[in-house]
Swiss-Prot record:
Belongs to the TRAFAC class translation factor GTPase superfamily. Classic translation factor GTPase family. EF-Tu/EF-1A subfamily. SUPFAM superfamilies: EF-Tu/eEF-1alpha/eIF2-gamma C-terminal domain (SSF50465), P-loop containing nucleoside triphosphate hydrolases (SSF52540), Translation proteins (SSF50447). The lineage of its organism: Eukaryota, Viridiplantae, Streptophyta, Embryophyta, Tracheophyta. The keyword Nucleus does not apply. Residues 91-94 are annotated as: G3. Residues 70-74 are annotated as: G2. The modification N6,N6-dimethyllysine is found at residue 55. The gene is TEF1. It comes from Triticum aestivum. This is Elongation factor 1-alpha.
Length: 447
């Protein structure tokens, strides 16, 4: 056994019919951990249902259906391996909550793979004002996904097939858009592929012999290795809290920064509840320490399940413990709000795993979203396309941090009317000190 490969997380984005599922399914199918028996079962069902286009999207549809029905799928199904990396696809696109998950979830995407439908009409629909291609790319950039790979998909269905001219037209247009968003298009590989036929996915395609760049697999291998923030203080937003017979209370979540280990005394924000960590587990194995990116369950002593909730944040009681935010100042970009947003607006904020209404207490300035320069002080309102600095007050206790210190806890989506109306990053937080927070016996002993 050589050195274990680095794990990286990938978010697949693009317009609704661009072929995200087929492309992702194809990678997982060819390079992934899907059990051959499962594939055979899917193939048989596909044949019975006469789904010629089965191949790969079907695999993903099955996985998604099982996931949505709450059947926990072995998450290995969403993994695949390149020469250099273990890759996890952190969201299956086309999912209702995709945008929300992107915001709460992309915190840990190391690279976005943007899938473009290269067919006549398909590309134009995706990149149009209403298309999702733009929104997804903007979101990915705002939320700190610095690396991108662009796949010009469905090259087998361009006119003429595998058209170099069409590819070049798309590269030109998408590059200019990505540049506006903030990416450097010279650093973004544009790979012409067919997710269905498999051209340039893994092996080079003779159909595209005019293209000299990397295949999708090679482009994934060229991703810069991410630096994991294990030297920062612990921040672990809770996704769920379970009561497990014979063990007790087990909060579950992903370590975003720092490390968590047995024997550590943790403080949960926003309440300040403090207790000792008895054990830490990942995939049913005990760990001596968990690092950023690890999804773990950990057992805490003398704590009732009702004292912890999704959205609470575990932190090291001795190293910058998490606290409730009294208010915070954010830079927001209004993405799709039908009217105008003024002081007093109270939408829901999705930040890490919390989902809480906040009040836009004061619009401080309106700024140019490209340069960050101030355009207007104390504007009356912000509308679509505007960016501004806003002071916000949570309506319930919540933990947020500045984007500069703890990026995953410093970015958010503003949701209203069942859609993402804005995204933002947090510039400053005024914190409250907890009063009368419970400190368990186990924690006192450790002091």
């Amino acid at each position: 056994m050589g050195k274990e490969k680095t794990h990286i997380n990938i978010v697949v984005i693009g317009h609704v019919d661009s072929g995200k599922s087929t492309t992702t399914g194809h990678l997982i199918y060819k390079l992934g951990g899907i059990d051959k028996r499962v594939i055979e079962r899917f193939e048989k069902e596909a044949a019975e249902m006469n789904k010629r286009s089965f191949k790969y999207a079907w695999v993903l549809d099955k996985l998604k259906a099982e996931r949505e029905r709450g059947i926990t799928i072995d998450i290995a199904l969403w993994k695949f391996e390149t020469t250099k990396y273990y890759c996890t696809v952190i969201d299956a696109p086309g999912h209702r909550d995709f945008i929300k998950n992107m915001i709460t979830g992309t915190s840990q995407a190391d690279c976005a793979v943007l899938i473009i439908d290269s067919t006549t009409g398909g590309f134009e629909a995706g990149i149009s004002k209403d298309g999702q291609t733009r929104e997804h790319a903007l979101l990915a950039f705002t939320l700190g996904v610095k690396q991108m790979i662009c796949c010009c998909n469905k090259m087998d269905a361009t006119t003429p097939k595998y058209s170099k001219a069409r590819y070049e037209e798309i590269v030109k247009e998408v590059s200019s858009y990505l540049k506006k968003v903030g990416y450097n298009p010279d650093k973004v590989p544009f790979v012409p592929i067919s997710g269905f036929e498999g051209d340039n996915m893994i092996e080079r395609s003779t159909n595209l012999d005019w293209y000299k760049g990397p295949t999708l697999l090679e482009a994934l291998d060229q991703i810069n290795e991410p630096k994991r923030p294990s030297d920062k203080p612990l921040r672990l937003p809770l996704q769920d809290v379970y009561k497990i017979g014979g063990i007790g209370t087990v909060p579950v979540g992903r370590v975003e920064t720092g490390v968590i280990k047995p024997g550590m005394v943790v403080t949960f924000g926003p309440t300040g509840l403090t207790t000792e960590v008895k054990s830490v587990e990942m995939h049913h194995e005990s760990l001596l320490e968990a690092l950023p990116g690890d999804n773990v369950g950990f057992n805490v002593k003398n704590v009732a399940v009702k004292d912890l909730k999704r959205g609470f944040v575990a932190s090291n009681s001795k190293d910058d413990p998490a606290k409730e935010a009294a208010n915070f100042t954010s830079q927001v970009i209004i993405m799709n709000h039908p009217g105008q947003i003024g002081n007093g607006y109270a939408p829901v904020l999705d930040c890490h795993t919390s989902h809480i209404a906040v009040k836009f207490a004061e619009l401080v300035t309106k700024i140019d979203r490209r340069s960050g320069k101030e355009l207007e002080a104390l504007p009356k309102f912000l509308k679509n396309g505007d960016a501004g600095i806003v002071k916000m007050i949570p309506t319930k206790p919540m933990v947020v941090e500045t984007f500069a210190t703890y990026p995953p806890l410093g970015r958010f989506a503003v949701r209203d009317m069942r859609q993402t109306v804005a995204v933002g990053v947090i510039k400053g937080v005024e914190k409250k000190d907890p009063t009368g927070a419970k400190v368990t016996k186990a924690a006192i002993k450790k002091k």
